[in-house]
């Protein structure tokens, strides 16, 4: 199986590479392939002739997007469309990564694939438009929505909390945002499994570590009582972009793939932190 991976230098892209080790993988980071350049994308896809294009590239600075709307839409919407259209031209399938932030957070229970998106921020609107461009491209397309990603590569909430704990508490964390923390390694393994299935039974899946928690609860689990964590409100955090208050995801469609469900978020976090501990000894 031949795979073109866009966004190979990001935190998910870097964990996808070992997960896809058994394939003929062609990874491109943003320096090697600017997905906003339609001509460059077409040339890369024509050269590789992949069975699958995986788009893990994104402009994911949620607050920064409020002041860089053109750039956010260029990457998250137009760039995704460029990859999907190029995939369609060579008969490749495309798997595109999206976000829980396409929802407005008013449901109050986990969102499934059948719930209607209502994005609140520039970032969220750009990601939702990217979904629509991919699904409307004519390619055999699959959108995976995930949430609150963390891994050892790149910047993420877990690494930020660990760094804050090293400096000493208290750490102030929002308690009125609830979501589904997801380890990039678990998501990468799920993606590797999905593209090996004969035909994904749905064009849209929610793929997250099971369960939900607030940012405050997540931070407390990360530090394990080593430093104090204090709850604050989203308003007190002073963030530019609006965020959904409750964006936990669940999947009504993943079981039909026959692939295992991802572990609970607590289990994934314990495994992640134990790997850090082992690396230090």
List each model region and its residues.
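Adenosine-cofactor binding site in Rossmann-like domains, unifying the SAM/SAH pocket
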Residues: 21-43
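SDR active-site strand-loop-helix element
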Residues: 6, 28, 56-57, 94-99, ...
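Mid/C-terminal beta-alpha module of Rossmann-like enzyme folds, strongest
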Residues: 190-191, 197-239, 245
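N-terminal Rossmann NAD(P)H-binding glycine-rich loop of SDR-like oxidoreductase domains
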Residues: 1-20
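Conserved C-terminal active-site "lid" loop/helix of NAD(P)H-dependent oxidoreductases
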Residues: 214-220, 232-281
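NAD(P)-dependent short-chain dehydrogenase/reductase
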Residues: 132-179, 185-186, 192
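NAD(P)H-binding glycine-rich loop region in Rossmannoid oxidoreductase-like domains
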Residues: 35-75, 86
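Catalytic helix-loop patch of NAD(P)-dependent Rossmann-fold dehydrogenases
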Residues: 67, 74, 79-82, 102-144, ...
